[in-house]
């Protein structure tokens, strides 16, 4: 995998995806002078003795408490230890790695006041595969993602646990030593700078975005295959229809469906003499639904790309004037809104697919396919219960899609009286994506089975490649058998990108392609 050169303030979504996936990271050396200037500004503030939040005061509701010069290092260590109060299952290592890279990019912009050696340690941990163990719960998305980032920072000072480059879990101090790194002694403001920020929420939201983008593409493929299995029409995908409505996502989704179905002998077989006038919405309105989901993902992607390239620390250091200004960039409301948009898109991708599965198993709607896609209905139940499973998963996602950003609860003795819930809103996306992937896996199986009943007619070249890829892993269902491993196999083909890769077409995504 090619190395990513991280230029703070100018990183693209594709670079963040590569970092999440384990690409080697190189910090642009051009940022070093700015880091040093900001650190010198903090040192000057300490020398002057003027009260500045987080440098020589307490935190949160305790901001009015002045801290003696001899206690400044203890203050920074204490905030890390006291704030490392997360609970729950650890976050996947790839997301922690992404969080670390986001924090690195923020610190490297020279507005946080940390020393070059602090940035260098975080950079080295990424380079040498030292990944802190970070519990998934405990952030409300303001004042930043304090608890998760405290667990990251605790590892930097040799406290807590890490995964080493081989994935072994061990004490943080031992992991640092194994990587030939020394624990950090925090300087003024550094504990707060490392804890304050939206990097945990943003990492989770980016992971959710990437997963949703993959599933949207897979959903276009399985949706097109369902059109052929149900002997549906491609007329609703005519570009003239969508040009009149002007929504970019809808236009792109319709174009993708047309290309996926191009050359289908199944479609050609019922161009003449078919008395059906219009298909049900789950087939006919795919461009409108999937296109709207694509537009949501693109909007969320733009927000998250901006957030990933910003600085969400507090206070912020301005070396040109020697000031440290208190603000609220740690409030993750933009990330929370983006996560809510991604959740809506994931919910609808799965919901529309489940409706297509329901259509395929119902002989009253499937245009000649046998009940539950089995040759001997009654003796065999076929795809009866996979459709029920899809319905269950879609219903779970409907509950999870409720906006997290509208829920706020005051913290820190009411000093932090409005919070974003971005971390919770972004973390649920991982489970929602798993559910949606399973629904699409079931649709893949059902649509391929439906096409099997239409033999010797064949679908398009793109969709026949998809069917062949599936059949290499899962045979046709002729008689009832134990289905769980086959559902898992089909879901893996969706999740891992094999379905989209087999289609061999450039399908639309968040970057506008």
UniProtKB/Swiss-Prot annotation:
PTM comment: Contains an active site 4-methylidene-imidazol-5-one (MIO), which is formed autocatalytically by cyclization and dehydration of residues Ala-Ser-Gly.
Gene Ontology, cellular component aspect: cytoplasm
Signal peptide: none
CDD domains, A to Z: PAL-HAL
Highest taxon of the lineage: Bacteria
Keyword line: Cytoplasm, Histidine metabolism, Lyase
Residues that span the membrane, as ranges: none
Post-translational modification 2,3-didehydroalanine (Ser), affected residues: 143
GO MF assignments: histidine ammonia-lyase activity
Reaction equations catalysed: L-histidine = trans-urocanate + NH4(+)
Compartment list: Cytoplasm
S-S bonds: none
Pfam families, sorted: Lyase_aromatic (PF00221)
UniProt cross-references to NCBIfam families, sorted A to Z: hutH, PRK09367.1
Membership in a protein family: Belongs to the PAL/histidase family.
Official protein name in the record: Histidine ammonia-lyase
Lineage: Bacteria, Pseudomonadati, Pseudomonadota, Alphaproteobacteria, Hyphomicrobiales
């Amino acid at each position: 995998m090619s190395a990513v050169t991280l230029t703070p303030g100018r990183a693209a979504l594709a670079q963040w995806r590569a970092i999440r996936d384990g690409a080697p990271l190189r910090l642009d050396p051009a940022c070093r002078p700015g880091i040093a200037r900001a650190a010198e500004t903090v040192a000057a503030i300490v020398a002057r003795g003027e009260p500045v939040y987080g440098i020589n005061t307490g935190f949160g509701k305790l901001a009015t408490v002045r801290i003696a010069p001899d206690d400044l290092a203890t203050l920074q260590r204490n905030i890390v230890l006291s704030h490392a109060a997360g609970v729950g299952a650890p976050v996947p290592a790839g997301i922690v790695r992404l969080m670390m890279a986001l924090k690195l990019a923020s610190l490297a912009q020279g507005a946080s006041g940390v020393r070059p050696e602090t940035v260098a340690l975080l950079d080295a941990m990424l380079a040498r595969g030292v990944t802190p163990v970070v519990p998934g719960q405990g952030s409300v998305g303001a004042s930043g993602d304090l608890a998760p980032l405290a667990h990251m920072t605790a590892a930097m000072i040799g406290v807590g646990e890490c995964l080493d480059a081989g994935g072994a879990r061990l004490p943080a101090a031992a992991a640092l030593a194994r990587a030939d790194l020394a624990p950090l002694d925090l300087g003024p403001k550094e504990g707060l700078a490392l804890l304050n920020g939206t990097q945990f929420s943003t990492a989770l939201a980016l992971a959710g975005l990437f997963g949703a983008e993959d599933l949207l593409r897979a959903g276009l493929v399985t949706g097109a295959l369902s059109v052929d299995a149900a002997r549906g029409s491609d007329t609703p995908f005519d570009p003239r229809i969508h040009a009149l409505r002007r929504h970019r996502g809808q236009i792109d989704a319709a174009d993708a469906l047309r290309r996926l179905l191009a050359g289908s002998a199944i479609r050609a077989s019922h161009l003449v003499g078919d008395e059906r006038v219009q298909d049900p919405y789950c087939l006919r309105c795919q461009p409108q639904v999937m296109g709207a989901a694509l537009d949501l993902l693109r909007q969320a992607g733009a927000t998250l790309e901006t957030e990933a390239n910003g600085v969400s620390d507090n206070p912020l250091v301005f070396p040109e004037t020697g000031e440290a200004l208190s603000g609220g960039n740690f409030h993750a409301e933009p990330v929370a809104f983006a996560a809510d948009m991604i959740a809506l898109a994931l919910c609808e991708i799965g919901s529309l697919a489940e409706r297509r599965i329901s259509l395929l198993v119902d002989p009253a709607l499937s245009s000649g396919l046998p009940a539950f896609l089995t040759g001997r209905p009654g003796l065999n139940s076929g795809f009866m219960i996979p459709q029920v499973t899809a319905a269950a998963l879609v219903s779970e996602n409907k509950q999870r899609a409720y906006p997290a950003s509208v829920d706020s609860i005051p913290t820190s003795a009411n000093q932090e009286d409005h919070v974003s819930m971005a971390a919770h809103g972004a973390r649920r996306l991982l489970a929602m994506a798993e559910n949606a992937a399973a629904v699409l896996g079931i649709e893949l199986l059902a649509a391929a089975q439906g096409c099997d009943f239409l033999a010797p007619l064949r679908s398009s070249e793109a969709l026949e490649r998809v069917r062949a890829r599936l059949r290499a892993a899962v045979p046709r269902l002729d008689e009832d058998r134990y289905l769980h491993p086959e559902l898992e196999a089909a879901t893996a083909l969706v999740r891992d990108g094999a379905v989209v890769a087999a289609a061999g077409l450039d399908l639309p995504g968040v970057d506008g392609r």
